[in-house]
Amino acid sequence: MSEASNKQMKLIKRLSDELVECILSFLPVQSTLQHRVLSKRYRDTWKLSRDLDFSGIFSVRRSQSEAVRIIEDVFIQHQGPEIDRFVLSLDHTGVEDKILSWVDTCLRKNIKELVLDFSSSKKVMEIPLNFSSSETLTVLKLQWCRFEIPNNLPKGLRLLKTLSLMRTEVTNEMIDSIFNNCIHLESLELVKCQMSGNGILTIYAHDHKKFKSLVVSCMPNLLSIFLDAPTLECYKYDGYAKTINVLKVNALEEAEFHYSRSKRRHSSDTVVDSMLACSAVHALTTTNILLEAITYRYLKGKLEKPLFKFENLREFKIFFKAPTFCTLFDIAEFLKECPKLEQFIIDIQNFTFEPQMYFWEIHHKAQIQNTSNNNYLLKCLTDVKIIGYKGHWHELDIVEFFVKNAPSLKRLELQMPKNAKNDAHTPDVARIKLIKTIFSGVKVTEV
């Protein structure tokens, strides 16, 4: 053993048992269970564990009954005064009573973070868990689990900062109770939840000073979102473009709109309405549906110009999904309205431009490739990334556009999927060589 190792061992031996046990109690319980045979001195420290993370309990091919037995033993023999964290991921069928008992134990021992994932059962756990007495809980994440919160709780959930609900029935009364009781709430996630009633989600957080982040994802029966949150900084929406977003969000800095196309309703107007509150954001992630709605459009037989100017936008990422008529022209017209843009990412992993694009060739190509008037000069742009690059001729149009119109360009990365070689096009060597004479920093990677 080296001299340095000897010194470390001597230092450890000088520590009191109480101090070492306190330090070890903060380790995940599965780690202390696995290593308890290595030291007789600390073989029982798992009984004091504060971090009861059982998320990977099936990773060693245990059966459901074996996993439940291990968790039950931990709770029966737990001697610590507090439990900081409890993470559980299993099929709740047949063990609901045990789960309720475990959660009750956590609540009695001042739990701070509680994560319950019952998605493996494919059935929502209908037995409601009562959090009304919790005065310490700061993080609550429930998947496939019924959630109830009475209004005007005297104590419970006052310190809650993060709430994430998945596959839970949501009512506006519940949302009101959340914001009435959880006065320190910073982040709310609603994923694959069922919106009851009229399909209108109303979030009134006008008096909240700490509410910073909202995620609304995959709620198919949602018709409208009315959001009044002056302190909100990050808003993420994933769903049909038909859903109307009415937003009062003065502090918004980051927005994501992962739109899916609705077959029943033309979505341009609802997309435009949603963007009214987002033109001042610094970072924007979206799909080509946004471009279709806010770049040049024909309205009543007349060609309308873009509706928005994104004066503060610095980061822009767009996912292309078929079908779409969008081309480099639509991208360029959008970017022209972003004078401070520094980073641009386009993801075309699941998209391929058409072999022939006559409208582009006839109406837009000459306009975009004409650099004499500098209509598309991107002075601040430094980073460009194309994810899913396959060497298509129009992808090279996009690459050429950026090397010609971004004088401050530092990095241009083309990410080619390793498993998409069959979709890759024959390289246009001459054109690639021309592009590299303009900007030598083009980097092709495989991911």
Swiss-Prot record:
Residues 384-416 form the FBD domain. InterPro entries: At1g61320/At1g61330-like, F-box-like_dom_sf, F-box_dom, LRR_At1g61320_AtMIF1, LRR_dom_sf. Gene3D superfamilies: Ribonuclease Inhibitor (3.80.10.10). It comes from the Eukaryota. Pfam families: F-box, LRR_At1g61320_AtMIF1. Residues 10-57 form the F-box domain. PANTHER family: OS02G0105600 PROTEIN, PTHR34145:SF77. This is Putative FBD-associated F-box protein At1g61330.
